[in-house]
Design a protein with these regions (language model features):
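Short, P/G- and charge-enriched loop/turn segments at secondary-structure junctions
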Residues: 69, 132-138, 220-224
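GT-A fold catalytic core of metal-dependent nucleotide-sugar glycosyltransferases
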Residues: 59, 75-127, 149-150
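Short internal beta-strands
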Residues: 31-37, 120
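A recurrent flexible, glycine/aromatic-enriched loop bordering the glycosyltransferase active site
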Residues: 136-147
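Short, acidic, metal-binding catalytic loop of nucleotide-sugar glycosyltransferases
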Residues: 21-29
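A glycosyltransferase accessory/donor-loop signature
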Residues: 4-7, 17, 152-282
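Glycine-rich phosphate-binding "P-loop"
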Residues: 1-11, 64-68
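Active-site-proximal specificity loops/subdomain of glycosyltransferases
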Residues: 40-86
Length: 282
C-alpha cells in the first residue's frame, strides 16, 4: 500500500506531521506526493527518508484537467489529480490535516475490485441535500474525500480527473463542495464504505458531545460513535480544528500527540524514535 498526498507548499508543515504519524504506525511501500510543478516539498521527502521509505514526487502536468478551472478553485482538485496513479497498486490518499494513531493492516486486505475500486467513510450524519441532488442511495451515502483507499487500475477504469472536472463545471449548481460532490456523483454505487474510525471528523470528537449529531434521535449513526472512538485509526482535523487553533483545555490525547510530532519536525531523523500513539498514551 502506498501513502498518497496532494498539496502545495502552504500545507507542507501539516503534511509533515501527517506523514510522520502514518509512517510511525504502518509500513508503506512508498510515499507519493502530488504538487504543482514548482512546489517540490523537500521537508516531506526528508521525513519519509528518515523512515527509510522511498518518495515519488509527481508534479501536476500543465495539461492537467484542473487547469480548466479558475485558479482559486484548482487547489481543491489536487486530490482528484492524485487519484490518477499509473503504477498499479493500492493507495491510501489522505489530506494533510489527518493524523494516524493506529495500525492500518486491515486496509491492506480489504477487497477492492472493478465493482468497488474505492473505499471511503460516510460523513456519519445525514446529508439529505447531497443525496437528493447527487442521486445517492441514502442521506448517509455521501463520503468525505479526506481519506480514500483505492486500487489504481480499477479506479482508472471507472473515473478520470478529466471526468471529475467536467462534472464539477457542468453541474456547478449541484456541487456545493466542489470536487467532493463531483467525485461522489461519479462513483456512487461503486464505493465500499469504511467505518468512521478511519476518518474521524471534528464533529465526531468526544469533546463535541453536545453536538446535535451525537444524539441518536437526530442521527441514527450516532450510536456507532463509542465504537469509533474505541477503534480509532485516523483523525481528521476537519473544519479548521487543528490542535494549534483549539484551546488547550479542549485538547484530547490525539491533539497532544499531534503537537508532540509537530514540535519534533525540526529534526526529521529523530521521528522514527518517537513513540506510537498507543505507547505514548500509557
Amino acid at each position: 500500500m502506498h501513502l498518497l498526498l496532494a498539496l502545495d507548499d502552504g500545507f507542507e508543515s501539516l503534511a509533515a506531521v501527517a506523514i510522520s504519524s502514518y509512517l510511525s504506525h504502518h509500513r508503506f511501500e512508498s510515499v507519493v506526493v502530488v504538487t504543482p510543478k514548482d512546489h517540490r516539498l523537500h521537508h516531506l521527502e526528508a521525513v519519509a527518508a528518515a523512515f527509510d521509505v522511498p518518495v515519488e514526487w509527481q508534479p501536476i502536468p500543465p495539461d492537467a484537467a484542473l487547469h480548466r478551472l479558475p485558479r482559486e478553485l484548482q487547489p481543491y482538485f489536487y486530490c482528484i489529480e492524485a487519484l490518477q496513479q499509473r503504477q498499479a497498486g493500492r493507495y491510501l490518499y489522505v489530506d494533510a490535516d489527518t493524523l494516524c494513531v493506529a495500525g492500518l493492516e486491515s486496509l491492506e486486505v480489504l477487497p477492492l475490485d472493478e465493482r468497488t475500486p474505492l473505499a471511503a467513510c460516510s460523513h456519519g450524519r445525514p446529508m439529505p441535500d447531497r443525496s437528493l441532488v447527487l442521486g445517492l442511495e441514502s442521506p448517509f451515502h455521501y463520503f468525505n474525500a479526506g481519506v480514500l483507499l483505492f486500487d489504481s487500475v480499477a479506479l482508472a477504469e471507472l473515473v478520470t480527473p478529466a471526468a471529475v472536472v467536467e462534472y464539477a463545471i457542468s453541474h456547478a449548481a449541484c456541487c456545493r463542495f466542489r470536487e467532493q460532490c463531483a467525485l461522489n456523483a461519479l462513483v456512487r454505487d461503486r464505493v465500499r464504505f469504511l467505518p468512521g474510525q478511519f476518518n474521524l471528523l471534528s464533529w465526531m470528537r468526544e469533546r463535541e458531545h453536545g453536538n446535535r449529531w451525537h444524539d441518536p434521535a437526530a442521527n441514527a449513526m450516532a450510536a456507532c460513535l463509542p465504537d469509533v472512538w474505541a477503534q480509532l485509526a485516523i483523525v481528521h482535523c476537519s473544519a479548521g480544528a487543528l490542535p494549534l487553533r483549539v484551546p488547550r483545555k479542549q485538547h484530547e490525547p490525539v491533539d497532544r500527540y499531534w503537537l508532540m510530532l509537530h514540535e519534533a519536525m525540526s529534526d526529521p531523523d529523530r521521528l522514527p524514535q518517537l513513540p506510537r500513539f498507543a505507547d505514548w498514551c500509557r
